[in-house]
């Protein structure tokens, strides 16, 4: 293989990565200005303020030392999240389909699990000043009950993150394997080849149900309303992000936008059969999917309260059952 033959795909991946990160920084502004603000009948912030300029602004903010038993590990978690999302992005890129150990659904699920687990660690490693006045119960000398376990906002957020990993991730991961059952392979290249021969999975009954289940899992993974329980402003405020400042907060903003784009590309590959090839017409389909999913999410979020356990568990259970049903239909037909 010549040097130029190897260089061109690498350059294409790098350019696509830069565009994906840029689009990811613009999407939050589109959500807030053109969807949520219109629903609430207000002008809304500039498109670039919520993502692009927010990430730049945080770079110039003063860093703080978190009140953590392992401050270095705590501050490294946003970087770990970004790396995990980057690996999912590389799995989706068609230039990497020859690397079977990378371009398969098992690897994608593993990297997404790393991203989810990071929030559990962040919550357990942070003990912010915001939690200092919320000790349960009274620890003042002479109190009736003493020596009880001190509870922190971040501990609550960490336990919620663990709950999201155990229960909330079922819909997304079931949806990912519906195209695999239909195509008979967990490798992205085979799934795309199947759809090129038989048509997009989303136009089948199993695929249509799977797309709905995927979207529910998409919102859960992004911790968006009504599933924003790990950083609910009403009780845990910012949750695991509480003590992240400066460049570490920039990584939080950057990673969320990048994850939105990456999940959109993953949906396009699995349910439509269009890989993100930069210099092809198919990239237009990918861009449409990337934009449509967060717009629908913003509409749902604008009309949704934060779910409590009473609403969260039935929603996840129903979505999981739909995912199982779709897999059964895909296996039979």
What are the roles of these predicted feature ranges?
Residues 197-208, 236-261, 281:
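Membrane-water interface at loop-to-transmembrane-helix junctions
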């Amino acid at each position: 293989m010549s040097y130029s033959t190897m260089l061109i795909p690498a350059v294409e991946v790098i350019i696509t990565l830069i565009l994906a990160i840029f689009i990811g920084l613009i999407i939050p502004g589109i959500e807030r200005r053109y969807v949520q603000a219109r629903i609430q009948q207000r002008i809304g912030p500039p498109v670039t303020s919520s993502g692009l300029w927010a990430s730049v602004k945080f770079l110039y903010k003063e860093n703080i030392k978190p009140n953590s038993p392992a401050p270095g590990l705590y501050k490294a978690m946003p970087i770990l999240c970004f790396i995990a999302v980057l690996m999912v992005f590389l799995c989706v890129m068609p230039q990497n389909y020859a690397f079977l150990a990378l371009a398969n659904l098992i690897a994608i699920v593993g990297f997404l699990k790393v991203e989810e687990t990071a929030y559990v660690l962040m919550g357990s490693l942070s003990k912010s000043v915001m939690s200092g006045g919320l000790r349960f119960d009274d620890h003042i000398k002479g109190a009736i009950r003493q020596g009880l376990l001190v509870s922190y906002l971040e501990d609550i957020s960490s336990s919620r993150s663990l709950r999201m990993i155990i229960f909330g991730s079922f819909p997304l991961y079931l949806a990912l394997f519906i195209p695999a059952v239909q195509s008979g392979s967990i490798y992205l290249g085979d799934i795309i080849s199947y759809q090129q021969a038989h048509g997009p999975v989303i136009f089948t009954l199993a695929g249509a149900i799977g797309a709905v289940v995927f979207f529910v899992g998409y919102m859960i993974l992004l911790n968006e309303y009504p599933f924003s329980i790990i950083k609910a402003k009403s009780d845990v405020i910012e949750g695991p992000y509480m003590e992240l400042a400066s460049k570490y907060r920039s990584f939080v903003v950057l990673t969320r936008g990048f994850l939105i784009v990456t999940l959109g590309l993953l949906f396009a590959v699995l349910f439509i059969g269009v890989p993100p090839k930069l210099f092809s017409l198919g990239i237009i389909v990918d861009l449409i999917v990337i934009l449509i999913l967060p717009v629908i999410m913003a509409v749902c979020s604008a009309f949704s309260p934060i779910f409590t356990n009473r609403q969260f568990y039935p929603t996840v259970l129903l979505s999981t059952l739909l995912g199982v049903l779709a897999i059964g239909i895909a296996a039979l037909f």
